[in-house]
Amino acid sequence: MVLAGVAQRPWIKSCDRAFYGSMALSAATTEAPEQTGFWALTLGGIGVVFGDIGTSPLYAFREAVAGAAGGAPASRVLVLGVLSLILWALLIVVTAKYVLLLLRADNNGEGGTLSLMALGRRALGRRSLFLLVLGVIGASMFIGDSMITPAISVLSAIEGLKIAAPALEHYVVPLTVLVLVLLFGVQSHGTAIVARFFGPVMLVWFATLAAMGAMHIMDDPSVLAAINPWYAAQFLASHGTIGLVTLGAVFLAVTGGEALYADLGHFGRRPIQTAWLGFVLPALLINYFGQGALVLSNPAALENPFYKMVPEALVLPLTLMATAATVIASQAVITGAFSLISQAVQLGLLPRFEVRYTSETNAGQIYLPRVNALLLIGVLLLVLLFQTSSRLASAYGIAVSTTMVVDGIMGFVVIWKLWRWSWPAAALVILPLVLVDAMFFSANLLKLLDGAWVPLLFGLAMAVVIWTWRRGVALLMIKSRRAEVPLDDLIGSLEKHPPHIVKGTAVFLTADAEFVPPALLHNLKHNKVLHEHNVILTIETMHTPRVEAADRIRLVKVSEKFSKVALRFGFMETPNVPKALVLARKLGWEFDIMSTSFFVSRRSLKPAAQSEMWRWQTKLFVALAKSANDATDYFQIPTGRVVEVGAQVTI
């Protein structure tokens, strides 16, 4: 196993930044409406941002009412109570918290849990371990959700076959597996071509939801009484533990709401707000109330109220449309997982994964083969283990509710410290929202033994990997520092006793520019030569999504033969070292790739007999290091210009 020292990211000077933003489908900022076209972004937002929450009507109302009824016929009070809970959950959690409040908390135009964390840590003016832990928890839970969302979404859509043709019930799981395998299989080819249809398809989907609901509200117009929050309060007060369990099912209606904030940087605040308030929210509410009216007029429809809303002849076309919508929702989650992992790698929280670019024009469209394979395995295991969307619904929600609680807590820090509100005013605004999130989180915990342990297990595994990697890298740096030589001392020694000088430029990638890179020491020791120009290169990942070209590079001339160069990248950028070094020409260094050699230090790790980490953790760290992709590829350095110097290290 070989480990590149520069790739381990201990040299990242500002670890107080976010590593999980939103899906890297575009690079629009909050000013994008003026640049790209407001309505085009609004349509794009409908296709990407609302895919997850837009497919919730397939199962959310059914699961909530069925769970509350406990096998008995659903009473009017029960149906109205559930509808009222869904309505006010959408208004409080999604509309008030995310659409009206957190969409204003952007990090240079970007949103998402980790961007919020970066804002909070910046506002505190110090490295806050508490906020970092919250960010890791939020990111870890997203990975768990990334496996459940495709499974439950596609499975619930294809279950429409049981309504259209009961004889096909046995084909639901195999067809679900087939669709998911195809979905993950095409990821390597990119989604640029089909992505342009996401907006129009979801536009038709939401219009269909509204039309279906509007037709059935007339079955029992009294269902509109559920707009009164009294029905929600009465339901919770009179149903005790059952009410709390039902709340966990009601939460299914708001899963995906966090995507509104996560995708802020892609579509802008105004397009997302317009799409939600003007189209998506009304369509969802009309459909939910239509399902409620249908169940009140025909209790037998509770078996699957969504598909019972259309004539039998239209069930199959609706199933196909629902499948398309769930595939789009799943695609958005998969892309988000790729983006999350890529940013975690960029910030040194995970080893380098192989990244393939699927678009020649948009660097944000990426494909991670290993991550894709792991997600597919996890999704298929969930489908085969749970078999139905009703069973899988028990596992859904805990990850999202955890993320929402995290967002609320960090939102308080931003409002208080960054927006400079008084803490009582900030608490007055955010505390009620956090309490609602906490209530949903508690409700989902009740489903722990029924399947909620699954995303928690996935999230825990992700958190352990991040913790192990950070701890291992830190210990590796401490061990390396003991043998390091100050750069100034070496330069002074070389000036007194100069070695043989060869033509050209040598760039040494290193963790800390104050000390001599191991590759430079090896070059002097074994080759006994020094280049005409020697550049000590460090790479910094900032706590902003992107770095302007003017701030990309810093160059300091140390001596006649030595310079220090620091390259800065945002946590959502893909580092391209040769391209960035071209900017050095403006600072006086005529960078020429053909006369430059890049020296990369690489370490081969072995578990030590005694380590500061647990034995299992040491083995995990070494395994993670072995799996790391090559630093040369990651920094996009031409392989013909790279010299690798290795050493074996025990940890």
UniProtKB/Swiss-Prot annotation:
Transmembrane segments: 38-58, 77-97, 129-149, 166-186, 197-217, 242-262, 276-296, 314-334, 366-386, 396-416, 421-441, 448-468
A single GO molecular function term of this UniProt record: symporter activity
Family note: Belongs to the HAK/KUP transporter (TC 2.A.72) family.
Catalytic function, reaction form: K(+)(in) + H(+)(in) = K(+)(out) + H(+)(out)
Residues annotated as signal peptide: none
Keyword annotations: Cell inner membrane, Cell membrane, Ion transport, Membrane, Potassium, Potassium transport, Symport, Transmembrane, Transmembrane helix, Transport
Record's protein name: Probable potassium transport system protein Kup 3
InterPro entries from the UniProt entry: K+_transporter, K_trans_C, K_trans_N, Kup
Main location: membrane
GO-annotated cellular components: plasma membrane
Membrane-related topology note: Multi-pass membrane protein
Keyword set includes Ion transport: yes
UniProt key word Transmembrane helix: yes
Pfam families: K_trans, K_trans_C
UniProt-annotated location(s): Cell inner membrane
Protein function: Transport of potassium into the cell. Likely operates as a K(+):H(+) symporter.
PANTHER family: LOW AFFINITY POTASSIUM TRANSPORT SYSTEM PROTEIN KUP, OSMOTIC STRESS POTASSIUM TRANSPORTER
Domain of life: Bacteria
